């Protein structure tokens, strides 16, 4: 018997074993239950590989997680934010993730990045609230925000514009409120407690400044007609 005759069945056996091994490792998309895999394929592109440094709201933010709460976080992941950049991921809402996968993502984000002990005894502002008084919000903005964003919100050497029409068209009123409350630590933006001890914003002031920011959003068609201002 030739060496070739011996190696042929042996090579075929190895090939078949390799194929079977690959088949056994394949997992259907709706059966993936590993958080790292789910996060990498669905969340990291906007929220960053480690929950930070992405274009969207950081998830690796204990204050944000404390304010939004577990149930609301799961709801946003499942149903998204209509009309904005956050899509719905639940299959029941047109997404690709099962209810089990939604729960895995939400619970693991909480388990890995929340720090509830840091907020014991802290009166956190409510995640949602009605818009307040925009006129008074202008005064609040000048007191808390103008130092970095300019008196009219168009920006300064310390911070960018928060009234850019393109920006306001992309974010919801809830997103504005979340940013006012939780800040953006990675960008040097303080939370509602301000960077001055004892000078925290009241719940009414939060609602008022969000109302003022919302009032700067152009009406449909105005941005296309007038053009977006530079940030």
Regions found by a protein language model. Name each.
Residues 1-8:
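Bacterial N-terminal signal peptides that target proteins for export
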Residues 15-18:
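C-terminal motif of bacterial Sec signal peptides marking the signal peptidase cleavage site
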Residues 32, 36, 48, 52-78, ...:
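Gly/Gly-Pro-rich "capping" loops immediately C-terminal to redox-active cysteine motifs
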Residues 20-25, 29, 33, 40, ...:
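Flexible coil segments in periplasmic/lumen-exposed cytochrome c-class electron-transfer proteins
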Residues 10-13:
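Hydrophobic helical h-region of N-terminal Sec-dependent signal peptides
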């Amino acid at each position: 018997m030739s060496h070739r005759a011996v190696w042929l069945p042996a090579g075929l056996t190895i090939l078949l074993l390799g194929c079977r091994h690959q088949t056994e490792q394949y997992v259907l998309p709706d059966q993936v239950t590993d958080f790292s895999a789910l996060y990498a394929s669905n969340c990291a592109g906007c929220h960053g590989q480690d929950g930070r440094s992405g274009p969207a709201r950081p998830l690796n933010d204990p204050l944000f997680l404390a304010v939004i709460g577990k149930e609301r976080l799961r709801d946003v992941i499942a149903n998204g934010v209509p009309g904005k950049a956050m899509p719905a991921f639940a299959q029941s809402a047109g997404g690709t993730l099962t209810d089990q996968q939604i729960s895995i993502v939400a619970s693991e984000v909480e388990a890995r990045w929340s720090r509830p002990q840091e907020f014991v005894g802290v009166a956190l502002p409510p995640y949602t609230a009605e818009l307040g008084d925009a006129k008074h919000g202008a005064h609040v903005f000048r007191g808390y925000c103008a130092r970095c964003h300019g008196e009219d919100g168009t920006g300064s050497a310390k911070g960018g514009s928060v009234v850019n029409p393109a920006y306001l068209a992309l974010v919801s009123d809830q997103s504005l409120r979340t940013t006012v409350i939780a800040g953006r630590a990675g960008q040097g933006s303080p939370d509602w407690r301000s960077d001055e001890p004892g000078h925290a914003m009241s719940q009414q002031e939060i609602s008022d400044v969000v109302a003022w920011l919302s009032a700067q959003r152009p009406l449909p068609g105005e941005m296309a007609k007038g053009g977006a201002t530079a940030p």
